[in-house]
A protein has these predicted regions:
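Serine-esterase "nucleophile elbow" of acetyl-processing enzymes
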Residues: 20, 27-75, 90-99
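Short histidine/acidic/glycine/proline-rich micro-motifs that form metal-
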Residues: 44-45, 78-80, 152-153
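Secreted/periplasmic serine-hydrolase-like ester/acetyl group-modifying domain
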Residues: 250-253
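Short, basic, glycine/proline-bearing loop/turn elements
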Residues: 74-78, 119-120
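Structural motif
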Residues: 80-88
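Alpha-helical cap/lid subdomain in secreted, periplasmic
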Residues: 89-221, 225, 229-248, 259-263
Length: 265
């Protein structure tokens, strides 16, 4: 993980008290807005000015939701389902989540890192065990948990076909969702199909390819917008959100709508 990404993680923790304070103020001032919380990794996380043009899909999701559905993006660079728990980040979400809210959980990129015991989980055992803690925590507070399979990386074989990169993790999540009776957003399958349709060259315009970096994991604004659109469509398809709660599913969303705030000191 680069220095920039470590700084982003620190900034996210620093912002937590402000986020909780703002939530408390909003609740005291009037009717409670329904909130969709995101627990995830760098592919979904808020990015700051020093990381631009890298963009998490969570930054683009509000463009596809009506204003009465707020987005609280708690995703943080470099986290797995395990390390997010161990650092107390789920506890922060559970301190503010409530009835009618949604907890969207998407992990696997860093769960796959077998060389790092602080992050690694095994798909059919510890990965599922960790995910259950998110499901149980949301349910205990009257919120709705939702699982999203991990968005695919940009990887093609010699024949130009997009290939999956997440091993058994998507299958393990699908099985858990079925066993637990929770909605599943199959972003892994949908993003793989999207990269296949776009092809080797055009997908470069969706990922964080710059003059100095060829990043096949993280997105630029068009890529984040495309993935957020997939997420919003799945939220509608699975009836997690109602038709009145989504918008622009088939409309162009300009990349210029993405902005990067300065990182918190």
């Amino acid at each position: 993980m680069s220095l920039t990404r470590r700084q982003v993680g620190s900034a996210a923790l620093a912002a937590v008290p402000l986020a909780l304070a703002a939530t408390g103020t909003a609740r005291a001032a009037g009717p409670r807005t329904r909130t969709l919380y995101i627990a995830g990794d760098s592919t979904a996380a808020q990015k700051y000015a020093d990381a631009a043009p890298e963009t998490g899909w969570g930054m683009a999701l509000p463009f596809f939701l009506h204003r009465e559905v707020a987005v609280a993006d708690h995703a943080v660079n470099g986290r797995s389902s395990k390390s997010f728990l161990d650092e107390g980040r789920l506890a922060v979400i559970l301190a503010s989540i409530g009835p009618q809210d949604v907890l969207l959980v998407q992990f696997a990129h860093n769960d796959e890192k077998s060389e790092d015991p602080t992050r690694y989980t095994e798909p059919w055992t510890t990965y599922q065990d960790c995910l259950r803690r998110y499901l149980d925590g949301a349910r205990e507070r009257g919120a709705r948990p939702v699982l999203a399979t991990p968005v695919e990386r940009r990887r093609f074989d010699a024949d130009g076909d997009a290939v999956p990169t997440h091993g058994a993790y998507p299958a393990a999540m699908r099985a858990l969702a079925e066993a637990e009776g929770v909605a599943l957003l199959d972003i892994e399958a949908l993003s793989l199909a999207l990269w296949q349709r776009l092809g080797v060259e055009e997908t470069k315009t969706y990922f964080n390819w710059t003059a100095t970096e060829q990043d096949n994991t993280h997105f630029n604004p068009p890529g984040a917008i495309a993935v957020a659109r997939l997420v919003a469509r799945e939220l509608l398809r699975t009836r997690v959100l109602a038709p009145r709660e989504v918008r622009r599913l088939d409309e162009d969303v300009p990349a210029s709508w993405i902005t990067w705030p300065d990182a918190t000191a």
